[in-house]
Amino acid sequence: MNRRLAVAASCLAALVAAPASAQVDFTGQWAPLYQEDTIERVPGPELGDYTGLPLNDAARLRADSWDADRISVVEEYQCRPHSADYSLRGLAPLRISADYDAQTQRIVAFHTYIGAYENRRTIFLDGRPHPPDYAAHTFQGFSTGVWTGNRLTITTTHLKPGYLRRNGVPRSAKARLTEHWTVHGSYLTIVSVLEDPAILTEPLVRSQSWFLDPGQRAGLFPCEYVPEVPAEPGTVPHHLPGTNPNLQEYLDWYAVPAEGARGGAETLYPEFQSKLRSYKPKDRCERFCNCVGFAGCLSPTGP
């Protein structure tokens, strides 16, 4: 009898202890909320808007050269997918699936599928190392994850060059992306930390949120290369330093002080306010005034 009790107690202890090593199930269909940086993510950032970005001078110079016609003229840009760091902020649903170890039934990999550009990424949880620096770089990079309690921390390297914003702000192949995934009920929050020594002077921290939507379907994204604007072969629309006439529009539309619009690490901290004592906001909003969620951001003047 004592032996039976001991065995039963042992089994019960194992069941009670199991949740301590349990893994959070992130699988499902997740719909984006667009509650963070709505204008930047839905209609897209204005030209010259580098607010909130700890850019260095080289990145700012590169961004100033941007001409939106580049996408229409250079066909290779038209179907270029979002990279792993930007896919999280794009206009598309997210589907997460998992692979399980046959012996332990523990999750050994997550797979993400984002509708925009049909981006697919694998996040390995089996402890494998990242490849050497000279290994191939891709738009989704190489991702591994580790558990910290109920939080999954993901590290992604080997990213092809991409962009931080869709207004020409670049992101280099030296970038390293760290993500922290957490679930609260039916809400998924991902806090991302991007380090890029070629572009940023400090890490760039952003967050994105989704809600569980079982009825959602992340569909296909057919994309066709089409010459939209006539141009001579080999033309790449751009602006030389100091010649971009469109950078002033953002300052005028929103009455944003030029010192803040240019970005830089110092603009992220409260002490920077002391440099803006003469700043006076506009008396009333004139552009994207109702930009809350998706529908209210489709037009500068509202729905």
Where on the chain are the PLM-derived regions?
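Bacterial N-terminal signal peptides that target proteins for export
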Residues: 1-9
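Repetitive helical segments and hydrophobic/amphipathic motifs
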Residues: 11-13
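PEST-like low-complexity, intrinsically disordered acidic/proline/serine-rich tracts
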Residues: 22-303
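N-terminal signal peptide c-region/cleavage motif recognized by signal peptidases
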Residues: 17-19
